[in-house]
Amino acid sequence: MKIVGIDPGISGAISVLRDGNISMVVDMPTMAEGTKSKKQINAAELTNILTKENISHEDKVILESVSAMPGQGVTGMFSFGQSFGVIKGVCAALKLPVILVRPVKWKKHFNLLNSEKDASRTKVIETYPYISSELSKKKDANKADAILIAKYYFETLGK
């Protein structure tokens, strides 16, 4: 069974674990939204990624379930909600089972509650040194989050 971990949002990421090992991690595919400099999730490319990885209804998609955050603003939350909906829609179209996990659950499992965003990147590099080149920049913390979301399911529910 493959486990897909998704950190949703425009700056999010997608990871795939096979037997507990990372087989793929990429930034969330995006595209321009109209003529503005804003971005949106590229649903077609997300579909391509999941299809190329041979993700099927026998696998699991673990999607971080987030809610409104103080100070984010209405426009930002609406945009985030759209991104979340696109991800769920792609998974539904591909008939992939989606399991939602709250950030507090997976972060607590890895002792990352109230830690810096970059702590997840450090944790993944310690656990999977072979992936360090994929996580060399601070912005790669979202990739690390996607990996840990999948790993959380693997360690707690997916065995």
Predicted feature descriptions by range:
Residues 1-159:
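Phosphate- and other anionic-substrate recognition elements at nucleic-acid/protein interfaces
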